[in-house]
Amino acid sequence: MNNTNEALDAEKKFKTSVEEAQDYIENFDILETINNVGNDEVFTPVKVCQQILDTLPMEVWSNPNYKWLNPCDKNGVFLREIALRLDEGLKKWEPDEELRRKHILQKMLFSIGLTRFTSQVSRRTVYYCSQANKKFDGKVDSEGHSINGYAIGNGAWFDTPEGNILTPKTEHSFVKGKCIFCGTNEKGKDGKPGRYSDPGQLEHYAYEFIHDSDIKTQIQKRFFGGKNMKFDIIIGNPPYQLTDGGGGSSAKPIYNLFVEQAIRMNPKFMAMIIPSRWFSGGKGLDEFRARMISDKHIRVLHDYLLAQECFPAVSIEGGVCYFLWDRDNEGKCKIFTHQQDGIIKTSERYLNENRTVDILIRDEKSLHILKKIQQKGFNSFGDIVSPRNPFGVGKLNDELFVKNKVPEGISIFGRFDKGRETKFLKKGFSVTKGNDLVNVWKVFISKADGAAGQIGNPIPARIIGKAEVGSIGTICSETFLAVGPLKNREEAENVVKYMATKFFRFLVGIRKNKNMTQDTYKYAPLISFDKCWADDDLYRLFGLDTNDIEYIEKHIKELD
């Protein structure tokens, strides 16, 4: 009896394995195996593409007259998924399968590849061949399969190799060393041509959609021979940044340029997935943020605090979001906040609901708490936070330090080989700025602490590290900010304790981005430091109720 059961169990396991293998083969998608071209260009997983398409109204799938554009095509996944939905939605309009599919690919779906390579990949995905007009040449293998391949419709649906998926043909326009469209540098630090201008490089990443001052005319020439045609729906996943190869070491965001260019084309609908960093920060994104949060045409916004939920193999600081822009309908935006714990919080509000707030606050509860605190009318703690590199300290080397403090000499607090420590500087060390903070009490706080997390990622999050008292005659290295001037040591110690409260760190977390600036501390109130404040004192002072307190306590971690 036992042998029989074992045999049946073995047979069942075998059948299950076979079924799983068969299911994998049937549902296998080659696009899921393609890695990203680089950090700037992140391929869109099929599932994410489908979720973005789900934000569009149902009527778009049964309208044969709409023209769709992906201005930043990387692998054809958007056009393919759109084509599949249109093929189903247009069955009543055109029952003949071949005529229906020909109409969809010929008359409705268009894209511009980001590079030569991605254009070919996209055509291979959508047309089954990198040449849209390639016909079957009659050569087959022993099993009857075409050796050299051929395009959909046997290459007869298009007259050109590109079809409606165009290869970019633009270059950067450099004026005084910078591209006038995307801002990238013409030359590297060594004075030689950079990666975006080097004639020896095959790709210069001059993305066509954002490298033309009259994009409407350019698009009409490229796709419609100059005819006055327009696109009804624009959708895509633009490249996120261009690495700064010149004097700076950071990367310049460019996804905002794609969004703004798409809006200029005035489509009926527009949907894109981009980093969420624009909510509260990002290099050169202040004007973009102001326009976005005041735009009442953004009707749906999905915000992922953890980017890996959309892009498993990619780390994107601050998360990612996708949104729907609706030209003909203004109103409140439906916001879906996808937290790390799998919880999705929903709200419906104008993105600039609180006119005193100049950023997009991710969740409604944080906005509610901030409103209560702002009603008390306190000044901003950011008013006593220094700019970056408060004392103008450059590169430090051992020759600048001495073992013992010299008369009238100064000390420097920073992160050295042994971690945080204070060292004595040689007499005559020049402080180039922030002299008003040298001979007073102050507090030092790190300007960068990505590991401390953000509100909602993780839960709970630390937000900032431990602040340190800065004594009279002590400055700090460029990796710290200074808070002051303060009257005495007691006041400085009270500031350190205030900055350690969950109340303070929650308000900092609302604005926190990768790098901390004085602006990061804008929402924390500037209170009296004649006394030592604890969280309970602050909750009472600002009239926070039980729900407010529970929310803060849940999301902010105790400091060690």
Predicted segment positions?
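SAM-dependent methyltransferase catalytic region
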Residues: M1-L301, L306-C310, G319, F323-K332
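A structural signal for short hydrophobic/aromatic patches embedded in well-ordered alpha helices
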Residues: I52, S122, V495, I552-E553
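A short structural micro-motif
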Residues: Y128-C129, K502, E558-L559
